[in-house]
Amino acid sequence: MTKTAAGMKRLIAALRKDQSPDGSWNYPFETGISTDAYMIILLRTLEMHDEKLIQGLAARILSKQEENGAWKLFEDEPDGNANATLEAYYGLLYSGYIEKEDARMKAAKKFIREHGGLESANVITKIMLASTGQYQWPESFPIPIEIMLLPLSFPFNFYQFSVYGRVNLAPILILSEKKFSLQTKNSPDLSDLLTTRARWEIQPEYRSLFSFLKEGVEELLGLPEQLHSLAMDRAKNYMLERIEPDGTFYSYFSSTFLMVFALLSLGYSKDEPVIKNAVAGLKSLRSDIDGLPHIQYANASIWNTSLINTALQLAGVSSNDPAVRKANTYLLKRQHVKFGDWAIHSPHAKPGGWGFSHVNTLNPDVDDTTASLRAIARSVEDNSEYQDAWDRGIQWLVSMQNEDGGWPSFERNTENPWLPFLPVEKGEYMFGDPASADLTGRTLEFLGNYTNLPAADPLVKNAVNWLFGNQEQDGSWYGRWGICYIYGTWASVTGLAAAGHSNHPSVRKACDWLKKIQNEDGGWGESCLSDSQNSYVPLNASTLTDTAWAIDAIIAAVDQPTEQIQKGIQYLLNSLDKEDWTTAYPKGQALAGSYYIHYHSYRYIFPLIALAHYHGKFGE
């Protein structure tokens, strides 16, 4: 057996071992300590005494503290992250399992104060602090609740925000309008973290935006008081109508956390079923890592299962293999049949996409849809059930293409020219869902390699032109949901190659860039600093996932194995058992500078895909 085949065999065996009885893979979707701290704060605020969970979460948070008292979002983040440290500090104190006078807490407090105190917190953290009585709400939030009433024709309306922006914004608007806060007799005192006064100031230019919107609503629709009440009801109903079967609001941690506080502000009791179900849903996001509980931001079972199932088949596992069949059955049961918010921007499309998690029934996305379609592709020909799922998935996917030719994540044509004017740091990430290189590239790769759509089709040509028009000067592409330029370049190159452009100057330039940044050990590695600095930052170490992405891109674009490919393949084969900080380094991001993801599955998926493509194209 060749070394490449042996490497693939080892990865396949590891994946087979980790498959769940229902056919899914449930590798952790690890997102730092923020959700763990918020879960403690939520349980303590609601006076739900799940001590075993709270103690476990506190232990996990403490295990991640740096020697200087701070918490980091990723290994090479300089010094630490003030916002994460504040969240950890608050969660630990509220847990009751560590005292303020503990040396570790003193070090954390010192770090927070040296980096701006409570005032330095990001907007979501400030909302959490205000909701739990630790910070004062601003006199007026930059976006008035009346935005809920503005018609789609208005230049600034609720549905111009991304879906993940809306689901967080609806409860925030209620909370800020009510200026709600809830403390308990055990609430920690964080006043010593204030460097000035606990006042959330909104700049004058944003207050004028607030007034403009409020006046616009009144002019369009009528009397202020009646509108106010109607807007509050609409925000409340927006939440309640989008609760998933597990009790979560759109299956996200943050939106569910905020919904609980918003409902409390509207007079719901802590014992209401909707509150209890929401908390139970958040608890179900638990995933144990190294013996300690972690509350995931979301469950990634559809993403994991579809990617792994595709990788197995690329590596030679038959579509009739029990592992593949079970996984496909799992995916088929979770194809969407309901209309969600996406239908507002695509009124002629019908349901047929897939979402990120197994409980997601309303919010499909382009990435999970192409991933699931790849997984079932080899089962379609002789099975009418799979053929129907395939046809519905394709039509939904095609309907999501933006007018600019690119693909967004969740909804088409939600470009919002107002986003730069909102006083929310990284608002373009939180509230925007523009086309991205990773979504567009992967969709092109799927259409080119898995369907009969010709390269001359306008849908393909427009996507290709979008990628050509959005390439960076150095030859790379920026990836929205991964780290970052290697990720975007991999998706773009493989997509363009599948569309017949492997010899295009843009693709050659991208491959030259990848070759230039290869490390001496044959691998590749990119820092999470890239996304906040808007340019490639090397990690100064190689990772399995980065290396797999880079190799896979070059393989797609060349006819013969190059020296760079050979060195990269050798790095992968020598590093499959690697266990160090690079293994746990985040490869995904959702909010630049604030929110990073360690997908535990990636170390298996992408090396297996790269090895399979290498073996299939070049042999040994």
Task: Report residues per predicted region.
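Preference for long, amphipathic alpha-helical scaffolds in soluble/luminal domains
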Residues: 1-620
